[in-house]
Amino acid sequence: MTDILKTTYSEEVFSSALELMPGGVSSPVRAFKSVGGQPIVFDRVKGPYAWDIDGNRYIDYIGSWGPAICGHAHPEVITALQEAIEKGTSFGAPCVLENKLAEMVIDAVPSVEMVRFVNSGTEACMAVLRLMRAFTGRDKVIKFDGCYHGHADMFLVKAGSGVATLGLPDSPGVPRTTTANTLTAPYNDLEAVKKLFSENPDAISGVILEPIVGNAGFITPEPGFLEGLRELTTENGSLLVFDEVMTGFRISYGGAQEKFGVTPDLTTLGKVIGGGLPVGAYGGKKEIMSMVAPSGPVYQAGTLSGNPLAMTAGIKTLELLKQEGTYEKLESTTSRLIEGIIQSAENNGIAINGGSVSAMFGFFLCEGPVRNFEEAKTNNSELFGKLHREMLKRGVYLAPSPFEAGFTSLAHSEEEIDRTLEAFDQSFSVIKN
């Protein structure tokens, strides 16, 4: 595999974008600040591939940050959307497609008895926090360092030594009063959670977390961690919330809660359930969800919620995922990929640790294990930046940050994995010196 990268047109377009949008992008990670180099401007995507506007083709392991689990522009999804768009792009009224997707989600996800569709994962997490507080009559919430729940003020909290229980805001413009009720703990640390419950008796509405961390790199729950959170929240009259925006329908059809056998009270979803279109959802027990307006007093609304195109793409995507052997294929593909990456790094004398669950994977360039965000920050970010640039030259598109999980799809075949591992071999050989 040889270097293919030429990005003249991307450079021109991105230079113009810098004058039009903050940082030249619509979401910060796309600016390549974590890895350096030239951001890629895409032209089209298909299957496991993405093409930039200079004509370069990449094997894509971002998948639009998770939604493209069937591969980009799956023909059955495209056909369904073409038929749906003839009926209109937005109704702003109930449609039968909402019922169908809701039934599919409820049938699949153990915790969900009722569901509300929104437009993004951030919206879902904002709404679920309001619902947690209303249902319990308590204001405080526990989140984990490195777990991302969208960009709403109450979740933008920096954890760590000395501020673990102070709820200090992690972005300018977020008042301390907004985050004062947000408590934080290290991921995989049950004792820290117990301490927070002990210090805040009858005050914590619930615990929210990514059951597999995907926004601090790829970090899995240690045995007993999720089970322990379930016990602690139940004992303290609090709710357990799984943010499955990333893991939902990706690591199994029923999400992380099915995979690990731990059922939360509420769940947030997104990405996969929209088949590549903007979507989010939150759901849970009927007694809790019945508090959401107009059934109850907890207000939440959205102009484009339940959008017929998003519902259509979501329905077709879930139909494809429900076919026999789907998750076995994803597991096999991703396991082979991450095992090959780790072996390649070790062959070149580069410290690495990583892993995968179904169609989700990640690695850190450091000694392991990595169990939380503090340990993740020992990753050699400079070396990762070099690796990212070398992989781009060889036609492989990884997340432009060491703190983002990677994704495979049903469209990734043995051929793509072979070519990817060849690119890793060459890239590790270059950067080791």
Curated annotation (Swiss-Prot):
NCBIfam families: hemL, PRK00062.1. HAMAP family: HemL_aminotrans_3. It is found in: Cytoplasm. The modification N6-(pyridoxal phosphate)lysine is found at residue 271. The keyword Isomerase applies. It is an enzyme of class 5 (isomerase). Pathway: Porphyrin-containing compound metabolism; protoporphyrin-IX biosynthesis; 5-aminolevulinate from L-glutamyl-tRNA(Glu): step 2/2; Porphyrin-containing compound metabolism; chlorophyll biosynthesis. This is Glutamate-1-semialdehyde 2,1-aminomutase. The gene is hemL. Its EC number is 5.4.3.8. GO terms for molecular function: glutamate-1-semialdehyde 2,1-aminomutase activity; pyridoxal phosphate binding; transaminase activity. Belongs to the class-III pyridoxal-phosphate-dependent aminotransferase family. HemL subfamily. Keywords: Chlorophyll biosynthesis, Cytoplasm, Isomerase, Porphyrin biosynthesis, Pyridoxal phosphate.
